[in-house]
């Protein structure tokens, strides 16, 4: 978890350089309740979704994903409004807003298992 947190912090620093107004929102931190996923060939989260889909997840600000292996065919994380597919590569970090602007889905790997870690930057009470 420490390596994941360190990688997220480095990526977040770059993200804030690109979007400096992020420093103007309420205080936030990495939720340590991360999710390790192993997606088998033909599986995936096929439904379009966003990470903040109502009051039950209203504390989520950013989605943070790190791919733990390369996937040669399929397995992309696809973003609807951005018309973007991100191929899993070991160590690749993806950070995006948790909001409705970034609906996404996990396309199924064709062969081989896709491994990744998901975490969320969340608003915290002062």
Task: Specify the residue positions occupied by each region the protein language model found.
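Fe(II)/2-oxoglutarate oxygenase catalytic core
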Residues: 1-93, 101-126
């Amino acid at each position: 978890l420490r390596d994941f947190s360190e990688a997220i912090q480095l990526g977040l620093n770059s993200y804030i350089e690109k979007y400096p107004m992020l420093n103007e929102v309420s205080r936030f931190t990495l939720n340590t309740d991360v999710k390790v996923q192993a997606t088998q060939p033909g599986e995936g989260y096929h439904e379009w979704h966003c990470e903040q889909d109502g009051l039950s997840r209203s504390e989520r600000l950013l989605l943070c994903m790190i791919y733990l292996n390369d996937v040669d065919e399929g397995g992309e994380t696809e973003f609807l409004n951005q018309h973007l597919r991100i191929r899993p590569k070991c160590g690749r970090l993806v950070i995006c807003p948790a909001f409705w602007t970034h609906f996404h889905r996990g396309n199924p790997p064709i062969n081989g298992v896709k491994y990744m870690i998901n975490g969320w930057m969340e608003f915290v009470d002062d």
